[in-house]
Regions:
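N-terminal intrinsically disordered, cationic/polar leader segments
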Residues: 1-51, 86-101
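Short, solvent-exposed, charged loop/turn and helix-capping segments
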Residues: 68-85
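A generic short-segment signal for beta-strand/edge and adjacent turn/coil regions
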Residues: 3-4, 63, 80
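Extended amphipathic alpha-helical scaffold segments
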Residues: 39, 66-73, 96
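OB-fold and OB-like single-stranded nucleic-acid-recognition modules
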Residues: 55, 74-77, 101
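Alpha-helical segments in soluble extracytoplasmic regions
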Residues: 51-66
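Short, well-ordered coil↔helix boundary/capping segments
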Residues: 56-59, 82-92
Length: 102
């Protein structure tokens, strides 16, 4: 009787152990915009210390772009996404390579 009371009423399937369901490319976009802004500020300054700081922040943000994209790629996308969007693999591969080169 206890098993019947405590048994789940429906079965759900999740991509991870904790089905948070929060996947949004917005954070990757924000970090990419930060990379672009750091590059522009670097170009607009003659201050070596400021430039060094801009490079450090840019590299940190570029790594965050890659991290956010990798989470989407490894945790969110499933084979059916690739079937529906055949260019998805190349898009994510190119995006992470670009972030690494930034």
């Amino acid at each position: 009787m206890v098993h019947r009371i405590l048994a789940p009423r429906r079965t759900v399937h999740a991509h991870c152990d904790l089905p948070c369901g929060v996947y949004d490319p917005a954070q990757a976009r924000i970090e990419a915009e930060s990379v672009k802004a750091c590059q522009e500020k670097f170009q607009g300054s003659d201050d070596a210390e400021f430039q060094a700081r801009a490079v450090s922040i840019k590299e940190e943000r570029a790594n965050m772009v890659k991290e956010h994209l990798w989470v989407l790629w490894t945790d969110y996308f499933k084979p059916e996404h690739l079937e529906k969007h055949p260019s998805l693999h190349d898009l994510f591969w190119s995006a992470t390579k670009e972030a690494g080169a930034a």
